[in-house]
């Protein structure tokens, strides 16, 4: 059974790095943070990155059941990256299936109509999780596809999936530069130059009145939609009411179906059911 804990919106002053609203806001304003984070996790030098302008296409994928990535970037070597801050507490199975779904979106999006699948770009999906994955055995998991009969053979599909679990064990191979990031995700004070820079950027954002007002508007609309969904569910039935609420959140707050369902407290194991009814 999937374990999922619904989250409620925090006040503007309470937002931290692990809240997806603040995570996306700060990181998107500071591409150098994205580049540095990739370098820390991948332990390689990343050349210049640019934001991938595909949100419209992503929303229209899969009969409108697409997703809106937190940070979707491409480097100068044409490798595409998706970096996601996971707010809900997912079971390992649910998180793995979510990555599988994201990979499908990646692949569909990276090809233009009529292009050969051989032109699929190298892709790396990274989930930042402030909770345990696979019983917390590790803090950093990197997955590729290997042959079961001969594990020295790598399937050259150029896909990589990475999970950074701040609640997992710090194994000997945990990159030293990643440890301050894990600590910061766990609510500890920033201790490295990188996390201190992020922390300072977050503090500055909180002093920008227009950003505060934008969040308050977002918070108010989300609460209105949640209340609408509750009342709709009482009058029209639980499922029908939530379907209407999902649609309202998508229209009014420009949320993806997935984030709308998350905001309404729908468990990830139920996502496919509700998607089929939209």
Briefly describe each language-model feature range.
Residues 2-13, 81-86, 174-278:
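Short, charged alpha-helical interaction segments and adjacent helix-coil junctions
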Residues 1-210:
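Conserved single-residue anchors adjacent to enzymatic active/cofactor-binding motifs
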């Amino acid at each position: 059974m999937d374990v999922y804990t619904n989250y409620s919106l925090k006040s503007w002053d309470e937002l931290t790095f692990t809240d997806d609203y603040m995570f996306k806001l700060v990181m998107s304003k500071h591409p150098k943070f994205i580049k540095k984070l990739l370098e820390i996790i991948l332990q390689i030098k990343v050349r210049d990155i640019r934001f991938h302008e595909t949100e419209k296409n992503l929303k229209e994928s899969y009969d409108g059941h697409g997703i809106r990535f937190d940070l979707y970037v491409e480097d100068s070597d044409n490798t595409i990256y998706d970096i996601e801050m996971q707010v809900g507490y997912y079971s390992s199975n649910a998180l793995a299936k979510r990555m599988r779904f994201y990979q499908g979106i990646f692949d569909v999006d990276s090809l233009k109509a009529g292009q050969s699948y051989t032109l699929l770009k190298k892709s790396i999906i990274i989930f930042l999780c402030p909770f345990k994955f696979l019983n917390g055995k590790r803090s950093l998991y990197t997955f590729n596809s290997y042959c079961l009969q001969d594990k020295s053979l790598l399937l050259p599909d150029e896909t990589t999936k990475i999970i950074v679990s701040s609640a997992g064990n710090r194994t000997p191979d945990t990159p030293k530069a990643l440890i301050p990031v894990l600590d910061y995700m766990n609510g500890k004070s920033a201790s490295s130059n990188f996390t201190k820079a992020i922390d300072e950027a977050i503090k500055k954002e909180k002093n920008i009145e227009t950003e505060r007002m934008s969040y308050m508007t977002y918070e108010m609309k989300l609460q209105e939609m949640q209340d609408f969904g509750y009342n709709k569910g009482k009058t029209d039935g639980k499922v029908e009411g939530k379907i209407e609420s999902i649609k309202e959140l998508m229209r009014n707050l420009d949320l993806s179906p997935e984030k709308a369902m998350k905001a309404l407290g729908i468990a990830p194991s139920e996502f496919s059911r509700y998607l089929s009814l939209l």
